[in-house]
Amino acid sequence: MRILYFDCFAGASGDMILGALLDLGIDVGIFKRELAGLNLDGFDIAVEKKVINSIAVTDVNVIVKEECNHHTGHHHHCERNLADIEKIIDESSLKDNVKRLSKKIFSEIARAEAKVHNKSIEDVHFHEVGAIDSIVDIVGTAICLDLLKVDKIYSSPMHDGTGFIECQHGKLPVPVPAVLEMLKESNIPYITEDVNTELLTPTGLGIIKCVASKFGPMPPMTIEKVGYGAGKRQTGRFNALRCILGNAKEKEKIDDEICMLETNIDDMNPEILGYVMNRLFENGALDVFYTPVYMKKNRPGVLLTVLTDKEHEEKLVDIILTETTTLGIRKTTAQRYVLEREIKHVNTEFGKIRVKESSFGDYKKYSPEFEDCKKVAQELKIPLSKVYDAVNKAILVFEERNENALQ
């Protein structure tokens, strides 16, 4: 399992996160081509190596050519609300998963800003976050995570300084109110450093909060790459954020956190329920199932249960609320143990077919990939069971004789 760990010993900001991710070895040319899909004019991005405290780091600078320039080409003051930013993202040619994550991060920051300024989330205007450089930091981070193809993201506790900083709202205490709002009622551990300035920005915390599934020490893993992203402030210490990329040290059961969405339905056409299930799976649900239940007034109905990770939760909630007759959804956070899984290929008389390998210590088990077997059965017009038999036979050859059937 490929793991990314954010080591935020000196806090976190958007440019530090982006710099550390690029420092892991992402091709800057490919990154810039992906970023061009944002279709946002008026800026250049400079990515260069520098040295801080004798350590090589990557420094990212977004160079704004004009005071502000919307994607339409018209000039505006650099204050955008959430709808403005979502419109830019929706009208871009970015990948769908990059769009979803970018909007999720902006929504998290907007929620915090709206709360501290006593405004609705629709009325709050971004200043720092609405500026081009912060948009690039957030969307750029989503692009990097897509390019890295990690399975799990973890983070250290969040670190911040003390004192006051000057910003568009005047002189504010550190941590700034939006940061405290995002930390409130979260499971994110927070540490105050003896540094008289801001270390943790709303953009930095918003990104980490939305992508990390756990906070704490680095999990056991073999380290593949380490990246450092430069901070801009002079803090009197090594001001950088570190990203560590690696693989799970052992192929064992993984303690995983998921969200369970449930709702009871007794007034829907069952044909539509089947359609809803397909849509939920297509949009990232880990599992979807219906359970027969008896509801009030002795009505037979179904309990719809959807298992999802954090990344896809919001989209799946939208689908349930728009596609079904329900008026509400119950949400439960659950822990689960999962065997690590890898896709392998097995050589059969019908050619190579994928199998799922799951591991627990030295114990391994294999299961044929249904879609591959179905495709072979349909193309060759043979029983599906015959394809399964061929795959299972090849697996036995590998296990019993240790031949090179799996690659």
UniProtKB/Swiss-Prot annotation:
Gene3D superfamilies (UniProt xref): mk0293 like domain, Transcriptional regulatory protein pf0864 domain like
Keyword Chloroplast: no
GO MF term list: lyase activity; nickel cation binding
Residue ranges crossing the lipid bilayer per the database entry: none
Keyword Lipid metabolism found: no
GO BP term, example: protein maturation
Disulphide-bonded residues: none
Catalysed reaction equations from the record: Ni(II)-pyridinium-3,5-bisthiocarboxylate mononucleotide = pyridinium-3,5-bisthiocarboxylate mononucleotide + Ni(2+)
A Pfam family assignment: Ni_insertion
Entry keywords, A to Z: Lyase, Nickel
Enzyme Commission code(s) on record: 4.99.1.12
NCBIfam families cross-referenced by the UniProt entry: nickel pincer cofactor biosynthesis protein LarC
Family from the record: Belongs to the LarC family.
Functional note: Involved in the biosynthesis of a nickel-pincer cofactor ((SCS)Ni(II) pincer complex). Binds Ni(2+), and functions in nickel delivery to pyridinium-3,5-bisthiocarboxylic acid mononucleotide (P2TMN), to form the mature cofactor. Is thus probably required for the activation of nickel-pincer cofactor-dependent enzymes.
Protein name from the UniProt record: Pyridinium-3,5-bisthiocarboxylic acid mononucleotide nickel insertion protein
Lineage of source species: Bacteria, Bacillati, Bacillota, Clostridia, Eubacteriales
